[in-house]
Amino acid sequence: MIWDTDSIIQAYAQGYFLMSDEEGTLGWYTSSQRTLIPLDDRFRYPKSLQRVLNQERFTVAINRDFPAVCWGCANRETTWISHELIEIYLQLNQAGWAFSFETWQGNQLAGGILGIAIRGAFIGESMFYNIPDGSKVAMVKLVEHLRARGFVLFDAQLQNPHLARFGSYGISDREYKLLLRKALSSKCHLI
């Protein structure tokens, strides 16, 4: 099935995001409380991760293997990423909206973050790892990249304990929409 890319991006630009339910039915969602990854000095990570970063075991790439990142994010016991949603991500990637921010160890995909970039907003859809610390390093390097590119917003959608380790925080839907509007007025490009 071909989805209308413009309509999908327009919905994301209004604060909605796609998820599949337990039966695989795709739907649009929003949240009264939105989770953000800080792009300022509130961003933090464990000291043990600094040692991993200093070892430079991982290299970073964008869209080197976008489909593998999609499947890596979906490959869980319970997942909200259906086959149909992967097809949408692939379509958005072809149109220049969806990206994978990846870490590699040699020729092996270590981890990655799947997201949608609309001007100054990066909407993180999911992340995964194949090698320990792969997704954590991807998070640090993605935040550095977004800062360098002038991004205003890193939307993580829903809070979880893993994101809290990076200083993630919640804001109201009203605050989110104001920040999203500001981000959409910025002219940023992920690549």
Swiss-Prot record:
Cited InterPro entries: Acyl_CoA_acyltransferase, Leu/Phe-tRNA_Trfase, Leu/Phe-tRNA_Trfase_C
Annotated catalysed reactions: N-terminal L-lysyl-[protein] + L-leucyl-tRNA(Leu) = N-terminal L-leucyl-L-lysyl-[protein] + tRNA(Leu) + H(+); N-terminal L-arginyl-[protein] + L-leucyl-tRNA(Leu) = N-terminal L-leucyl-L-arginyl-[protein] + tRNA(Leu) + H(+); L-phenylalanyl-tRNA(Phe) + an N-terminal L-alpha-aminoacyl-[protein] = an N-terminal L-phenylalanyl-L-alpha-aminoacyl-[protein] + tRNA(Phe)
Enzyme class, first EC level, given as a word: transferase
Where mainly found? cytoplasm
Instruction: List locations, semicolon-separated.
Output: Cytoplasm
| GO CC, alphabetical | cytoplasm
Xref: Pfam families? Leu_Phe_trans (PF03588)
Q: Could you tell me which SUPFAM superfamilies the record lists for this protein?
A: Acyl-CoA N-acyltransferases (Nat)
GO molecular function per UniProt: leucyl-tRNA--protein transferase activity
GO BP annotations listed: protein catabolic process
Q: Which Gene3D superfamilies match?
A: Leucyl/phenylalanyl-tRNA-protein transferase, C-terminal domain
Q: Which UniProt keywords apply?
A: Acyltransferase, Cytoplasm, Transferase
Q: Please indicate if the UniProt record lists Transcription as a keyword.
A: no
Q: Does the keyword Transferase apply?
A: yes
EC code = 2.3.2.6
Q: Which NCBIfam families match?
A: aat (TIGR00667)
Q: Please describe what this protein does.
A: Functions in the N-end rule pathway of protein degradation where it conjugates Leu, Phe and, less efficiently, Met from aminoacyl-tRNAs to the N-termini of proteins containing an N-terminal arginine or lysine.
Q: Which PANTHER family match?
A: LEUCYL/PHENYLALANYL-TRNA--PROTEIN TRANSFERASE (PTHR30098), LEUCYL_PHENYLALANYL-TRNA--PROTEIN TRANSFERASE (PTHR30098:SF2)
Family the UniProt entry places it in = Belongs to the L/F-transferase family.
Query: What's the protein name?
Result: Leucyl/phenylalanyl-tRNA--protein transferase
